[in-house]
C-alpha cells in the first residue's frame, strides 16, 4: 500500500523555453471512487471487517483533503462547535431523588464529557457517524464509563444473515495491522439497542459499542458525507488551483498555462508494474513521469500543435485517461484572482452549510456585510439545525440513563443564543427541552 502523503505529487514545474508553468495536482473526485468490488478483509481466521473504500484509506484521504484547504477545515470546525452548543448535560427535574442527582454528578466527574462530546460532534460532521463505547461495572448493573472511538479508526464487521452488524474493530488502519493490535468490541443492534443490551449483559459482557449514524439515501456500511459534492464536483480543485497559481506568480512571475490532474491509481499502477517499493525511488519515478508530461507539452508548443485531447499521451504512444490536462487562459494578472477566490470560497461555504459572514471566510477583502441582527439570526438558525444530530447523538445517553435507573434525568444540549444590548448581556443558554 503506497503512502501518497509521503510523496510530492502536487507541484509547479516550469515549461522550458516558455514564460509559463504547469501545475500538477491529484484528482479530488477519486477519493469516493470504488475502483473495485468491496469484499471483507480478514484480520484472523475468526475476525473480518468491511474496508472503508477500495483501499481502506478513504477516511484518511478525506481528512487530508479537508486539512489541505483553509476554508474547508474552518467550516468543519465551525460546524462541530455549533453542534457542541453549550455542551452535553444530563438534566435532572424536580422528580429526581437526591441519590440520582449525586450519581449523575459523579458520572460526569469520572468521564471527560466535554472532550467526548466535541469529539463525536467532529466525527458526525466529518463522516456522518460516531461510535461511543459504554463500559459496565463488574456486577453488570451500572454503566460507569462512556468513551469515544474515533470514527476514522473504526471498521464494521460484515453484517450477519439478519442484516445486523455484530461488532466493530478499532485499530490504526493507516498501516498494516496484526490481529493483536485490533480491539474487537460487540456492537449493540442499532435498531433495538436497549433490548440487545439487556440480552448481552446476561452473557457476562461488560463493554459495548453504540453507533450514532446520520441516515443517508444510499445505505452503506460507511455513509458518504453530504459535502462529498465538493470533491466530486469542480470547486475544490478550482480553489486549490487558484492558490497554486498565486504562489507561482509570486515566486517567479510565471503564469500557470496547464493544469494536470493525476489520479492516484496512475502512480499505483506504475509502481506495481515496475516493482518500485522504495519511497525514494518512487519519488524519483514520479519526477521522471512529470518530466515526460512536461516534454509532451513543450513538444506540442514547439510544433505549434493545438491541444485537442485532454489526456496525456505517454512516450510509447498510449493515451493515459488517468492524467487529465487542462489548458488555462493566462491573461489573469496577480491581483485579478480576488473575484475568483471569493466565488470559490462562497461555493465551499454554501456546500458546508456555513454562512461566510459567520466564519470570516474572505479576510482582508471588502465585501457586503450583514447587520448584527442578521448575524444573530444566522447563528440561531445554524444551532437550531443541529436538533436532528442531537437526537441521534443522545440515543446512547438515553440508554445509559435508563440502564442506570436515573429516573427524572434526560440528556440535553443547550445552545447559546446571542442577545441584544437591551438585555444587558452578550449571550444566554436556551434549551430545546424547555
Residue ranges of predicted features:
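Generic structural hydrophobic/aromatic packing signal, biased to beta-strands
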Residues: 132, 146, 258-262, 325-327, ...
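Structured, contiguous alpha/beta core segments that scaffold functional sites
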Residues: 2-61, 106-303, 433
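Long amphipathic alpha-helical segments
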Residues: 161-184, 256, 285-369, 395-408
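A broadly used, surface-exposed interaction patch
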Residues: 89-116
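Extended, non-catalytic structural segments that build the interaction scaffolds
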Residues: 39-42, 47-49, 53-67, 274-285, ...
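C-terminal anchoring/interaction modules
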Residues: 295, 349, 387-434
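Intrinsic low-complexity, intrinsically disordered or marginally ordered coil/linker segments
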Residues: 3-6, 50-51, 60-74, 79, ...
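C-terminal structured domain segments
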Residues: 62, 68-69, 78, 85, ...
